[in-house]
């Protein structure tokens, strides 16, 4: 494709924001034979910066400049212009754009400098920067062209670890904003507790459950062996403890906001848990989540049998659930998001289009595409490109 040369004017307006500025500027340009090629506007701390690129007849340059300066005087703003012969074909929409989202509770200049440096080192160019959230976390989104996602991801992972910030990279295009399936772990992700620990406390066996958990972490037991051993310690507990434990569960801050916002935007929310359907079913009803899988406790004659009934929901089963729920909703696996914190979540995090480690163990963070270290589950929304204005914060 050949170059297209045109005489252009780049207009930069800055000043205190107030109603009517944009209207006045374009009214000043309206009498001339002008084509608008590009326009950008941002307001930060009540300061407006408006840039406009126009194509114009070179003979009209002085008249346009005079009218623009008169407009600036009326509005009490500054207007600077740059006129030049420009290859406007290079201004067309770029392919292969990447969205780089930086998430942190406190954004420092050094972190931004290193993010920008990593983008440059990956042969990327920053096309735009937008703040999508300011409190309780800060989210900044960079639109990047020219960089290879794999190379950029590798360099930014070092920046994230160095500065203790969270960074996610996603390609631009329709896939980023299509219907998604978001699958969540439960214990220490959707809720703040570990359900098996709550049940063990009712049996006075908390210390024994902890010993089994530590043995599993040392690799001496796999998840199924560990789960069955821990559930066996619950044998003889009255069925009524399930309701007691349900009353002790608290949602992770931002969990309700996350689920409600995703539902309102047309996405599907699913849940998988190494815990128990007996305990989490009322919570699923409360959150209006119909797609969920968890283990089932054996109950006979009003007591826990100390057994797990049916299929064990281990890491492989969690990944399979992701595929199954996606197929049921006719959602491509590339449009899925998996969120979890433990080793049992690794397979689903690897299988998903975007795997997110939430306040996770180091091995899980290393395996995930992105991570969230802030204590708010709804921070995940920013990694999905959903701005603060679209989020139901009244539910937090």
Region annotations inferred by a language model:
Residues 1-179:
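A conserved regulatory-domain signal marking ACT and ACT-like small-molecule sensing domains
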Residues 14, 103, 183-185, 272, ...:
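Short hydrophobic segments within beta-strands
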Residues 16, 20, 24, 59, ...:
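Conserved active-site and cofactor/substrate-binding residues in soluble primary-metabolism enzymes
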Residues 21, 113, 190-193, 345-348:
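Short glycine/serine/threonine-rich phosphate/pyrophosphate-binding segments
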Residues 83-91, 167-180, 213-239, 295, ...:
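Long, charged amphipathic helices and adjacent flexible linkers at domain junctions
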Residues 146, 187, 256:
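Active-site pocket-lining segments that scaffold enzyme catalytic pockets across diverse folds
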Residues 178-224, 228:
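Active-site neighborhood of HAD-like aspartate-dependent phosphohydrolases
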Residues 236-354, 358-396:
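C-terminal cap/substrate-recognition subdomain and adjoining C-terminal extension
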